[in-house]
Amino acid sequence: MPVVRISKGKFDLANASDAERLLLESERALRSALTALPGLLHYYVGIDRIHGALTNVSVWASLEDAHRLDTLPQMLAQRPILEATGVTFEVITNHETLWTITP
């Protein structure tokens, strides 16, 4: 079964436009590096402007594949950019799938 990797961050609502801009800009830095990784099935980047939250969710073929993001230079470079605008991150978690629905 696939592995779901979840990275969550929080930001002050006054910085929502900065957080959104940086998330959009991160696509340029990350897209080709991510698509080159073996095992990537899906990748989602989202923002909740009401609660001041952002999320990166990815789905991987295996736990080993998901952990490749732990050392991906392009990904590691993004964190301090977001933190400079006040984004704080929770611990990244990797969830082994127990069941799914795919309509």
Predicted regions and their residues:
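Short S/T/G/P-rich N-terminal loop/turn motif that feeds into the first structured element of a domain
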Residues: 1-54, 61-73, 84-103
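A common structural junction motif
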Residues: 76-80
